[in-house]
């Protein structure tokens, strides 16, 4: 095999990139880390605050020079040290409640990271943000320009913009945690990807989503949000977040199966090797097989998940020892829950079974999948604001059972925009007895919940759902706590022939347009 030096002899002078030895160069203000990778990667860490101030990859400066890359909006000050042990370099940045690590393996163009916390940062979220040169890295992957807000005019808060007639936001770059293994920024000659293989100390479960990328004009931001207040459904977890990896390449997209087991030998606080973990295996059954099935484990310290195989069989990721709540989902709709204990070095067998149970259905609008799939504007809501001109009319809409399309029913109703939604249906004489209208929702905002009328009868106002204190539908989120409301309809209320149901948003709060109280539909079913 030819050496690097020999290969350089065959390159024209303009194409040569200088190679240096793997190691640390220490200056009065910084540590300069050379990864000794074939496509050279060298980055600089500020010794007083842990900011990355330079990322030189294949001869190009990829770091935005106005502000560094860092945890949160920067640690301000930290105790920073760097050590080399054989083929590994570790930079350790410590404050009273946080320790952040940069780890480099000799020859790899990757900055591995992990973040250990004993308290939530004062800004109320835990993230790493790489602020990158958007002249060389203008693109965002995989969702493209939906989160490019450069040159935009703010239309909601400071995070939703109008750009060339389209609504855009950094929130529209999100992906469900269970599917988000890699997100990137790129240009014609460079690509930088965040590789995510460990969510155990994050919060929100398999279907939570958060900001991934944002070209905001000054720089292109590549994020890893470990937790935040963005439609957060559970308490933040302490301990070690990661490992997570920032991978530098020229044109190729890196794979997501990165081995970081070497962290076990680097004295990383809170790191638990596979040898000290256990697994759960078993079989899920009972749910509708037209949907993907997910099994989810969680406790106060960790969370894990996996898709099942087509026959329902599953094996968990390697888990920290402990007792977990184990949940089985049809799509994103919970159909069963149990408890399981995990021990180090062993696999626990635990089956789980459940299904959606209602009654004799008179009509059903949508499916019990925990998502607004198929409803009007659901296909666009993840990537644009409800006010976007590309959205279909929100109504108020009328849905006629038996003749309307699913897209004639709104994915959400807003108190000041399209409330109520009207449902018309025909009942037989045998269907005039007592019935239940079950309204599945996925997310509520500002206390919004449904109140029902059936013909001349008005149902009760439900108690207010838990306030997540976060904008949702306008920032591309649809999943919250998934409240389900059962409305008991007295016998004789439904008549033989034509009937009319209205579902309205009720709340003690108010707001303008799409920031008025609202909720998102999962499914609406009338049964006896």
From Swiss-Prot:
One of its GO terms (biological process) is cell wall organization. PANTHER family: RHAMNOGALACTURONATE LYASE-RELATED. Glycans are attached at residues 46, 148, 351. Residues 1-20 form the signal peptide. Belongs to the polysaccharide lyase 4 family. It is found in: Secreted. GO terms for cellular component: extracellular region. Disulfide bonds join 50-93, 184-193. Pfam families: CBM-like (PF14683), fn3_3 (PF14686), RhgB_N (PF09284). Its EC number is 4.2.2.23. It is an enzyme of class 4 (lyase). It comes from Aspergillus fumigatus (strain ATCC MYA-4609 / CBS 101355 / FGSC A1100 / Af293). This is Probable rhamnogalacturonate lyase A. One of its GO terms (molecular function) is rhamnogalacturonan endolyase activity. Pectinolytic enzymes consist of four classes of enzymes: pectin lyase, polygalacturonase, pectin methylesterase and rhamnogalacturonase. Degrades the rhamnogalacturonan I (RG-I) backbone of pectin. It catalyses: Endotype eliminative cleavage of L-alpha-rhamnopyranosyl-(1->4)-alpha-D-galactopyranosyluronic acid bonds of rhamnogalacturonan I domains in ramified hairy regions of pectin leaving L-rhamnopyranose at the reducing end and 4-deoxy-4,5-unsaturated D-galactopyranosyluronic acid at the non-reducing end. InterPro entries: Carb-bd-like_fold, Gal_mutarotase_sf_dom, Galactose-bd-like_sf, GH-type_carb-bd, RG-lyase_II, RG-lyase_III, Rhamnogalacturonase_B, RhgB_N. SUPFAM superfamilies: Galactose mutarotase-like, Galactose-binding domain-like, Starch-binding domain-like. Keywords: Carbohydrate metabolism, Cell wall biogenesis/degradation, Disulfide bond, Glycoprotein, Lyase, Polysaccharide degradation, Secreted, Signal. It comes from the Eukaryota. CDD domains: RGL4_C (cd10317), RGL4_M (cd10316), RGL4_N (cd10320).
